[in-house]
């Protein structure tokens, strides 16, 4: 049922040699980045563990429940990616204002970002209200559609809480304050685990809601995290001088436009990448319940691994933004290379875990032998794309800190939708490789993005050093 483990010692040796070389030259920047990134990574890991827990609970409830939650979660993430990406502009601008010692401008900027977050939440709610009626049009197996629709009808009520939480989180990260993200992430996990279990299986006096229970638990955690974060910022002495909630401001469209000019290309870039995975999930739904369940197992593990380079990339964005605000280009470049060294190291570790322990990982999700066999094969593909996935994420973070967002958006479109998706469709459907073909498309798209974004970083940094705008 399971594949033999390959000998990858040579590849590991090359990766560790590369990391050692970069650290020897830029090691002084590795430690500050790690200190800033660690709470972010742990916060992201807690988010990934939430997905892991939900999938384990759904998978042991039934294969249909897991498949329905997979489709529902995929369609939930589609609108969530836009506010996640767009509001990153707040981190970029706050870090640069902080670096330039213009803190009096941070409070007004934050209040306008809250208006933008509410607007994005309204868009998200509208999408999640409409899309359940369109599920039959996607060609998904009919058994999955009712559960996915119920899940989406429930989770839409968290549409406002989600962007507000990220708005507050990105503000904190721009101010080099990353511990709230970690604490709220694990706090949400502690609430979600027992609540989702109770609502899905009907334990502790609750009725058995099945996949709807997963949605109810998710919405509850979204609102708890948003409310607690708001209370923290309101009461925190660290940010008292910024007067974040000193008064209510009407929307200032000029400031909101500034946020959108930087953030919308980031949001579209993230949508391009996330959309590739989401559409891949919907297309694999055509191959049957076993294929989609196996895909979700492999994807959730890959997403958990992805949380590490994501946290490192966000920390790198903040540090580069701070350096740009101080006009310190040498530090900017050193911070970027330190980020690459860290990511190569983390992705080597992630790939090693997947290659060595895929059978143990799959066993934690399901005891269905057919699903387990398919998932174990897909986890090997997940191990392969750890490197391009981490490197493209880090390059994106570096470019965001440099306020270069529009060209990376175009490069993301080319990589994911000009290369990855067409190849995945050809291999998955034309050659009938099913989910394996679609995953090869993912690997090609991520590899292209890693190469193109790395090239873009080189071009932009050389222009900045030459004084070319």
Curated annotation (Swiss-Prot):
The keyword Transport applies. One of its GO terms (molecular function) is xenobiotic transmembrane transporter activity. Multidrug efflux pump. It is found in: Cell inner membrane. The chain crosses the membrane at residues 10-30, 34-54, 74-94, 121-141, 179-199, 214-234, 264-284, 292-312, 335-355, 369-389, 409-429, 437-457. It comes from Xylella fastidiosa (strain Temecula1 / ATCC 700964). Pfam families: MatE (PF01554). The keyword Cytoplasm does not apply. InterPro entries: MATE_fam, MATE_MdtK. GO terms for biological process: monoatomic ion transport. Keywords: Antiport, Cell inner membrane, Cell membrane, Ion transport, Membrane, Transmembrane, Transmembrane helix, Transport. Belongs to the multi antimicrobial extrusion (MATE) (TC 2.A.66.1) family. GO terms for cellular component: plasma membrane. It is a multi-pass membrane protein. This is Probable multidrug resistance protein NorM.
């Amino acid at each position: 049922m399971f594949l033999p483990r390959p000998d990858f010692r040579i590849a590991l040796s090359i990766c560790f040699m590369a990391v050692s070389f970069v650290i020897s030259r830029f090691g002084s920047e590795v430690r500050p980045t790690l200190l800033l990134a660690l709470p972010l990574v742990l916060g992201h890991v807690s988010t990934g563990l939430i997905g892991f827990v939900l999938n384990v609970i759904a998978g042991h409830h039934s294969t249909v429940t897991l498949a329905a939650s997979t489709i529902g979660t995929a369609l939930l993430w589609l609108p969530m990616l836009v506010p996640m990406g767009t509001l990153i502009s707040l981190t970029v601008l706050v870090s640069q204002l902080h670096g330039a010692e213009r803190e009096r401008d941070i409070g007004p900027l934050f209040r306008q970002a809250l208006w933008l977050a509410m607007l994005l939440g309204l868009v998200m709610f509208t999408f999640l209200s409409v899309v359940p009626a369109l599920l039959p049009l996607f060609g998904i197996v009919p058994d999955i559609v009712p559960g996915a629709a119920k899940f989406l009808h429930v989770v839409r009520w968290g549409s406002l809480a989600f962007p507000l939480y990220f708005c507050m989180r990105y503000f904190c990260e721009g101010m080099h304050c990353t511990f709230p993200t970690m604490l709220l992430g694990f706090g949400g996990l502690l609430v979600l685990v027992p609540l989702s279990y109770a609502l899905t299986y009907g334990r502790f006096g609750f009725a058995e809601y099945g996949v709807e229970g997963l949605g109810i638990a998710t919405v509850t955690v979204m609102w708890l995290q948003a409310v607690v974060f708001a209370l923290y910022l309101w009461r925190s002495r660290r940010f008292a001088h910024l007067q974040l909630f000193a008064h209510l401001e009407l929307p200032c469209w000029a400031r909101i436009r500034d946020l959108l000019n930087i953030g919308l290309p980031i949001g579209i870039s993230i949508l391009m990448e996330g959309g590739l995975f989401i559409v891949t999930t919907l297309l694999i739904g055509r191959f049957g319940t076993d294929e989609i369940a196996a895909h979700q197992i492999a994807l959730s593990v890959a997403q958990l691994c992805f949380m590490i380079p994501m946290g490192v990339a966000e920390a790198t964005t903040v540090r580069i933004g701070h350096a740009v605000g101080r006009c310190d280009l040498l530090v900017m470049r050193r911070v970027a290379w330190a980020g690459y060294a860290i990511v190569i190291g983390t992705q080597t570790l992630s790939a090693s875990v997947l290659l060595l322990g895929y059978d143990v990982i799959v066993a934690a999700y399901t005891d269905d032998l057919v699903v387990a066999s398919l998932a174990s094969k897909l986890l090997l593909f997940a191990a392969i794309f750890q490197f391009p996935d981490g490197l493209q994420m880090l390059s994106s973070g570096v470019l965001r800190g440099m306020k270069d967002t529009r060209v990376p958006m175009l490069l993301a479109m080319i990589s994911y939708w000009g290369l990855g998706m067409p190849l995945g469709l050809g291999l998955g459907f034309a050659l009938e490789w099913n989910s394996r073909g679609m995953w090869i498309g993912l690997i090609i798209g991520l590899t292209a993005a890693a190469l193109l974004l790395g090239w873009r970083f080189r071009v932009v940094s050389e222009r900045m050093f030459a004084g070319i705008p």
